[in-house]
Amino acid sequence: MREILADLVAEQQGLDQSLQRAPDRDWRQRVATGGVTVQDTIAILAWGEQHSARLVTGKVSIDDLLADYGDLTTFEKGGIAEAKGKRPQEIIEWWRFARADVVDALSRMKPGQKVRWLDGKIAARTFATIRLADTWAHGLKILTSLNKEIVDTPRLRHISWLGWATLPHAFDAAGEDFDDVRVELGGPGYARWVFGDDDAENVIRGPAGDWCRLVVEHSDDPGELTATGEVAELALAVAGIYR
């Protein structure tokens, strides 16, 4: 768990630092999607971490959360409502404490230890990867809205894997039949990340940044990604971690 948790913390700290000394007008700035502000987005992250800590420690079940909120949009509205009347510094402190609770709980687990999730149980390592992807996805919205530089990091490897690993679920959600897809990506610093069987007939190739933006649904533009095979072409249309 050490590697994924270190990268999760680094991703969170990077976004945190980008908001240090941000003027109030930045916090009121609307992000590109969802009709919410930067302040709302950090509140959504804090809300997500708060409930993630409760999930990991068994204080609440995913069934309880689904019964209370029903869907992701309603859940996020709960976070925005919780932050109403709070100052930006209060919200970012809320996020800091909540995310620390998640990391602490996950650090006590083995990588393969199971956490109850939407479609059953997932490994603790995968749960941490989802938290990293969520932080990065919301960070993209914030940094884009504030016209801040976005630098792709080697941490995209985790999100790249998650995008590939969730392809079967994305196909199922779209009502499509899935066949093996190999994903070959170029990461920062000339890294090469490959997921899937060597003999797969369907292959997606391109920059890791484009793939990650696609699977967190920050963009429906495949960018420089290319697809070989009908299933790979369909994967570019339906891929999404949150589907």
Question: How should each PLM-predicted stretch be described?
Answer:
Residues A174-D210:
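Glycine/small-residue-rich hydrophobic helix-like segments
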Residues G79-L140, T144:
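Contiguous mid-protein beta-loop-alpha structural module that forms a pocket-lining wall or clamp
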Residues Q12, L45, E49, R99, ...:
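Short amphipathic alpha-helical/adjacent loop interface patches that line ligand
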Residues D199-R243:
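C-terminal interaction segments
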